[in-house]
């Protein structure tokens, strides 16, 4: 018998259903990726509601862009009432179905939970969250020992080395941030 964790093994959440769209059972999703091909090439998905722990497998019949959202036509969802029941479900795909990236690019799941160290070897913490700011991503690093949060921009200036395979990141220390005051004033 398959457990839920087995069901989600090797899968990655790429979007969340946020609304129904139209009267024919389409759903509006917000993507969790900037790589549009991940969404536009969807074929088969696992829809999973983390609150109710319900899941639903479906074939994607059509994908349409809609501003910063996408609209999906899914097999088995035939009308607006059925589509509204899917609000809150996350859209999962197999990790193997993700498009390949060059060595400088990464998917968020590849760096979440990575161990972060300063150049001198001092442990900073683990990547807990990635924040999109518009200009560049920022990693939120949490150290469980002292409950400190450190924010580091994901730019070449601050990221010295990122090893996706080892889940480790070497970063440049932001002196004013570490001292607790803005020394630039």
Swiss-Prot record:
GO terms for biological process: ribosomal small subunit biogenesis; rRNA processing. This is Ribosome maturation factor RimM. It is found in: Cytoplasm. GO terms for molecular function: ribosome binding. Belongs to the RimM family. An accessory protein needed during the final step in the assembly of 30S ribosomal subunit, possibly for assembly of the head region. Essential for efficient processing of 16S rRNA. May be needed both before and after RbfA during the maturation of 16S rRNA. It has affinity for free ribosomal 30S subunits but not for 70S ribosomes. The gene is rimM. Binds ribosomal protein uS19. SUPFAM superfamilies: PRC-barrel domain, Translation proteins. The PRC barrel domain binds ribosomal protein uS19. Keywords: Chaperone, Cytoplasm, Ribosome biogenesis, rRNA processing. GO terms for cellular component: cytoplasm; ribosome. It comes from Petrotoga mobilis (strain DSM 10674 / SJ95). Residues 103-177 form the PRC barrel domain. Its main location: cytoplasm. Pfam families: PRC, RimM. InterPro entries: PRC-brl_dom, PRC_barrel-like_sf, RimM, RimM_N, RimM_N_sf, Transl_B-barrel_sf.
């Amino acid at each position: 018998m398959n457990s839920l964790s087995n069901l989600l093994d090797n899968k990655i959440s790429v979007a969340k259903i946020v609304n129904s769209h139209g009267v024919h059972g389409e759903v509006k999703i917000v993507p969790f990726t900037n790589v549009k091909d991940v969404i536009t090439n969807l074929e088969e998905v696992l829809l999973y509601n983390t609150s109710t722990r319900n899941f639903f497998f479906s074939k994607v019949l059509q994908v349409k862009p809609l501003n910063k959202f996408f609209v999906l036509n899914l097999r088995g969802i035939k009308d607006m009432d059925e589509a509204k029941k899917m609000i809150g479900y996350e859209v999962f795909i197999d990790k193997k179905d993700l498009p390949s990236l060059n060595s400088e690019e990464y998917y968020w799941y590849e760096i979440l939970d990575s161990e972060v160290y300063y150049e001198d070897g001092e442990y900073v913490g683990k990547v807990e969250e990635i924040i999109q700011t518009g200009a560049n991503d920022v990693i939120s690093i949490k150290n469980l020992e002292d409950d400190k949060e450190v924010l580091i921009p994901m730019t070449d200036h601050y990221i010295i080395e990122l090893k996706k395979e080892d889940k480790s990141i070497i970063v440049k220390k932001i002196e004013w941030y570490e001292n607790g005051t803005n020394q630039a004033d």
